[in-house]
A protein has these predicted regions:
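Accessory RNA-recognition modules of RNA-modification enzymes
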Residues: 1-171, 176-184
Length: 184
């Protein structure tokens, strides 16, 4: 698993500051990125080369997730692993279920559920994250995943996936959104 730090700075860093960040990165093995302005200004400081994708693994499911430093992920690996294990235990998937994962993000629960069900459809507002779900599905050789871009704070009534019969529903929303979608 890769650890990365994004250093948000509003003023130009001095050569000494940059050297300290590089020293920290080398001594810890972290990837260090600088962000002088908005999210589109994030650039890697160290290591100077290598893959741009970061990874985390959930060995219990045989999964490796690839993500960009600016993607949202669960930051506490131990809590994330425990949360996924508990969710899959509660879902008790037997391999024949159709699962709908709302607010799927990069596919944290989507991929885990796909290892234990017939089909999973993830729904997420961010096109980047939908792309990441599909990318991670291919990376992990999972062919039973679909992902849809949709803003779940809007009415789902006209969406074809909302009219289908689902055996299991996963809802892992951001701070807002669950109330609206579950009321429908």
């Amino acid at each position: 698993d890769t650890v990365a730090a994004v250093v948000r700075h509003l003023e130009q860093l001095s050569a000494a500051d940059l050297e300290q960040w590089i020293h920290l990165a080398k001594s810890t093995g972290w990837h260090v990125y600088l962000q002088p302005k908005g999210p589109d200004t994030v650039a890697r400081l160290w290591p100077a080369d290598g893959p741009e994708r970061l990874t985390y693994r959930i060995g219990e499911f045989g999964l490796e997730y690839q993500f960009a430093v600016t993607d949202f992920t669960q930051i506490n690996a131990a809590i994330n692993r425990a949360m996924m294990m508990q969710a899959m235990k509660l879902l008790d998937l037997q391999g024949s279920e159709r699962v709908l994962d709302l607010f799927c993000g990069l596919g944290n629960f989507t991929l885990a559920a796909a290892t234990r069900s017939r089909e999973v459809v993830g729904v997420e507002v961010s096109e980047t994250m939908v792309h990441r779900v599909l990318q991670n599905a291919r990376h992990n050789s999972l062919d039973n995943i679909q992902a849809v871009t949709f803003d779940l704070t809007k009415s789902i009534a006209g969406q074809s996936w909302a009219k289908e019969p689902w055996d299991t529903l996963i809802v892992d929303p951001p701070r807002s959104g669950a109330k609206e979608v579950l009321e429908e």
